[in-house]
């Protein structure tokens, strides 16, 4: 059975979609962009944006009673693959800090993202 996941701890959707959808032991998160839920601001640099996106993903997962180590796949969308080393540094630290293996991942450069952000990440997680 499908269950819509919605938490005020992470930014609300900016379009007609859910933050996440839980289906049995899976959770599928919509792409998250770096909006600070308290200030409603978007950081300027790619490092801060990457960290905030991952933080928002974690907040949605925790609300749904999942953890970072349950993530099995992410897709990273960025407007500048020349910044991949910075993205990878923050991404790697996030998973290590959360005592998690690295999930499967795709990374794609796109021309533009909503609200002119530099990064968006979607995730899928599974737990027994």
UniProtKB/Swiss-Prot annotation:
Family matches, as Pfam families: Ribonuc_L-PSP
Family: Belongs to the RutC family.
Top-level taxon of origin: Bacteria
GO molecular function, one term: deaminase activity
GO cellular component: cytosol
PANTHER family, per the entry: 2-IMINOBUTANOATE/2-IMINOPROPANOATE DEAMINASE RIDA, 2-IMINOBUTANOATE_2-IMINOPROPANOATE DEAMINASE
The protein's name in its UniProt record: RutC family protein BU371
InterPro entries (UniProt xref): RidA, RutC-like_sf, YjgF/YER057c/UK114
